[in-house]
Amino acid sequence: MKEVVVLTFALLSMGSVQAAQDPEAVFNRSCGMCHNGQLPTAPKKGDAAAWQPRLAQGTDTLVKHVTEGFNAMPARGLCMDCTAEDYKAVIDWMSK
């Protein structure tokens, strides 16, 4: 029985995924420099008209743009410790 418990715990810990960071905290730390209006081409938080054509490209494309850099967007969006899940959460938060 002890082996089953140990094996179960080991399997569960291998499959754990790092929880996404707080989107607002990531925005304030990394994204807000450009997305608060200082950079005219960067869509501002909550600007539905600016976000709509970007969201139409799909989340995977937007995450790729953040990760690799796109136009004036620096690679990794200045968040060096963000995961793809973090980027998805921040994109979702910013676009609302």
What is each residue range found by the language model?
Residues 4-13:
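Bacterial N-terminal signal peptides
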Residues 42-44, 65-94:
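Axial heme c-ligation environment in periplasmic c-type cytochrome domains
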Residues 30-37, 90:
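The canonical Cys-X-X-Cys-His
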Residues 24-28:
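Short sequence/structural segments immediately N-terminal
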Residues 15-20:
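Sec/Tat signal peptide C-region and signal peptidase I cleavage site
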Residues 36-64:
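Gly/Gly-Pro-rich "capping" loops immediately C-terminal to redox-active cysteine motifs
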